[in-house]
């Protein structure tokens, strides 16, 4: 095993000039309430997505903790789903190139992996690195998703009104990328979508849409989200039917709506200072969600 971060990845020598591109990262393995990050990633990868860099998964992946799938066909093994951690080249609706780091979150060597990402950013001339998150929070599905933005320089999101104070949550490799690269002078952003707690284990494309729209607003990319909009419309109708069929859910949603509307009216924005969960409450919700995921595995 090498200690040189450059040995953790292979970079395509035939890649085009990507100077000034944005790098998004959506690693599997951390909190993804409502599968919002997975849905956003799938939307981005739906078209042509050639790989420009591959990471050495054998050094980073714990195969016994997250076992890959093998396929058996009658009397022989027919296929193996090899874990892949790679940087894909994508284009927006204006044919502007951007990059997406996707795959399993490393189980080991986080610092070396983060240093390797920093090297890639330097080699490729990336101008900004953006990570996506989705976490459970006491908001209703019937109101706009109150996106949370954070980053290395306040100038990157000067129009955003921060409402969280100090908070401690379980770390992720994606968060470490934002922290280490930001400390090194690289522009980094994190965009997070709160998801209603009653939808945390389901698919909630509304949150995925909110993430991608915020990416566009912060980076200037014109992302095609039309397919996700179609899915979201049908999903919201199904959620509304399920809620209306349950007195308990109906009461919960109504209570969350009152809380949300009171907060929004007080601050004239989707996120206000008094009535949403405190940092401690949010941290507790994240801990509970992670514990539920671990039990599910």
Language model: regions and residue ranges:
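A conserved C-terminal secondary-structure "cap"
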Residues: 199-297
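Catalytic cores of processing enzymes, dominated by hydrolases/peptidases
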Residues: 138-218, 222
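Hydrophobic/aromatic beta-strand patches that form the interior of the parallel beta-sheet core
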Residues: 53, 99-101, 130, 187-192
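Conserved active-site and cofactor/substrate-binding residues in soluble primary-metabolism enzymes
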Residues: 35-39, 108, 112, 172, ...
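Predominant activation on well-ordered alpha-helical scaffold segments within soluble catalytic domains
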Residues: 38-45, 118, 174-178, 182, ...
């Amino acid at each position: 095993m090498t200690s040189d971060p450059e040995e953790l990845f292979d970079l395509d020598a035939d890649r085009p000039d990507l100077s000034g591109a944005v790098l998004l990262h959506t690693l599997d393995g951390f909190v993804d309430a409502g599968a919002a990050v997975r849905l956003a990633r799938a939307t981005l990868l739906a078209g042509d997505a050639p790989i420009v860099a591959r990471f050495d998964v054998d050094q980073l992946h714990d195969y016994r903790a997250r076992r890959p799938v093998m396929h058996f066909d009658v009397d022989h093994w027919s296929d193996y789903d090899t874990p892949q951690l790679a940087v894909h080249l994508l284009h927006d609706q204006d044919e502007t190139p951007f990059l997406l780091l996707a795959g399993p979150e490393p189980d080991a060597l986080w610092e070396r992996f983060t240093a390797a990402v920093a090297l890639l950013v330097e080699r490729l001339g990336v101008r900004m690195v953006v990570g996506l998150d989705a976490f459970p929070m006491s908001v209703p599905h019937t109101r706009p998703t109150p996106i949370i933005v954070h980053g290395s320089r306040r100038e990157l999101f000067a129009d955003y009104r921060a409402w969280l104070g100090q908070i401690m949550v379980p770390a992720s490799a994606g968060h470490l990328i934002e922290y280490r690269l930001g400390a090194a002078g690289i522009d980094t952003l994190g965009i997070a979508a709160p998801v209603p707690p009653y939808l945390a284990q389901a698919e909630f494309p509304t949150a995925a849409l909110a993430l991608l729209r915020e990416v566009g607003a912060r980076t200037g990319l014109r992302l095609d989200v039309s397919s996700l909009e179609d899915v979201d419309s049908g999903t919201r109708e199904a959620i509304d039917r399920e809620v209306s069929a349950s007195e308990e859910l109906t009461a919960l949603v109504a209570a969350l709506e009152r809380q949300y509307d009171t907060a929004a009216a007080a601050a004239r924005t989707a996120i206000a200072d008094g009535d949403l969960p405190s940092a401690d409450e949010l941290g507790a919700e994240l801990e509970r969600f992670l514990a539920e995921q671990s039990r599910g595995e």
